[in-house]
Design a protein with these regions (language model features):
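GIY-YIG nuclease catalytic motif and its immediate N-terminal context
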Residues: 1-69, 81-84
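Internal alpha-helical transmembrane segments
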Residues: 75-76
Length: 84
């Protein structure tokens, strides 16, 4: 049986700067949670089609690692817990 494709990769941006990379089954609801937690950003950008949870986790890790390589090892501003 095929695994459900119900997870999206997204990034939060403050103008042109990426401040968070994450995954969610409901990116709009997750954006509201980020706002309620005090995160500052101007928009959310969904970066993928619906993926399986495992594929989404792999893509999230790859995107955070790519960001770190391009920014001297630093993760996006709000990606404190998930750094690779």
């Amino acid at each position: 049986m095929a695994k459900p494709r119900d997870t999206w990769l997204y990034e939060l941006k403050n103008h042109k700067r990426i401040v968070y990379i994450g995954i969610s089954c409901d990116p709009d609801r997750r954006a509201i949670q980020h706002i309620n937690a005090g995160k500052k950003f101007t928009h959310i950008n969904v970066k993928s089609v619906a993926l399986t949870a495992k594929s989404a986790e792999r893509r999230e890790k790859e995107e955070i690692q790519r960001y770190q390589r391009q920014h001297g090892g630093r993760p996006p501003k709000y990606n404190i817990a998930k750094t690779y």
